[in-house]
């Protein structure tokens, strides 16, 4: 630290020996030279560097605006497509429901028709069976009636021990 203090002390003595000086509040020629160089660099930057950067930034901003517009348009198209989809699905569901109802009605009519046909066949079969049973009953009745006379005579002959048909005794 001693060396550093010695350097500062030597610099301050050299400034005092130089005759005293310059006031930093009063501009000197160096200030104007630096100011002119700064203005030239500023002009060069504003003339050749800033316009391309501004152009690129403007293009980027336009591209972002276009992308945002495209996104909005796409969102609207998606919403419209979704609405169309829902509409078509509702129509398809309605058509499917109508087709199901028609198929059920057709099925019921076929079932009713087959039931009526089966009922008719059953009635016809019952009528035929009734006729057959009546005919068989008549045949059996006539057969029994014809055999009753012979059987009753035979039974009477057995019980009485006399031949009933011939009128004699056994």
UniProtKB/Swiss-Prot annotation:
Residues 122-139 have a biased composition (Polar residues). It is found in: Cell membrane. Its main location: membrane. One of its GO terms (cellular component) is proton-transporting ATP synthase complex. SUPFAM superfamilies: F1F0 ATP synthase subunit B, membrane domain. It is a single-pass membrane protein. One of its GO terms (molecular function) is proton-transporting ATP synthase activity, rotational mechanism. The keyword Transmembrane applies. F-type ATPases have 2 components, F(1) - the catalytic core - and F(0) - the membrane proton channel. F(1) has five subunits: alpha(3), beta(3), gamma(1), delta(1), epsilon(1). F(0) has three main subunits: a(1), b(2) and c(10-14). The alpha and beta chains form an alternating ring which encloses part of the gamma chain. F(1) is attached to F(0) by a central stalk formed by the gamma and epsilon chains, while a peripheral stalk is formed by the delta and b chains. Belongs to the ATPase B chain family. This is ATP synthase subunit b. It comes from Mycolicibacterium smegmatis (strain ATCC 700084 / mc(2)155) (Mycobacterium smegmatis).
């Amino acid at each position: 630290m001693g060396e550093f203090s010695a350097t500062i002390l030597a610099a301050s003595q050299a400034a005092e020996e130089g005759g005293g000086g310059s006031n930093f509040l009063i501009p000197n020629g160096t200030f104007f030279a630096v100011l002119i160089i700064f203005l030239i660099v500023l002009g060069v930057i504003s003339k050749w560097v800033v316009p391309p950067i501004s152009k690129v930034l403007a293009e980027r901003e336009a591209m972002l605006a276009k992308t945002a517009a495209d996104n909005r348009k796409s969102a609207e198209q998606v919403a419209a497509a979704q609405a169309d989809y829902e509409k078509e699905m509702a129509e398809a569901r309605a058509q499917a429901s109508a087709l199901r109802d028609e198929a059920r009605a057709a099925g019921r009519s076929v079932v009713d028709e087959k039931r009526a046909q089966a009922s008719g066949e059953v009635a016809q079969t019952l009528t035929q069976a009734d006729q057959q049973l009546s005919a068989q009953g008549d045949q059996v009745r006539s057969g029994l009636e014809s055999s009753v006379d012979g059987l009753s005579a035979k039974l009477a002959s057995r019980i009485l021990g006399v031949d009933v048909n011939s009128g004699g005794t056994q």
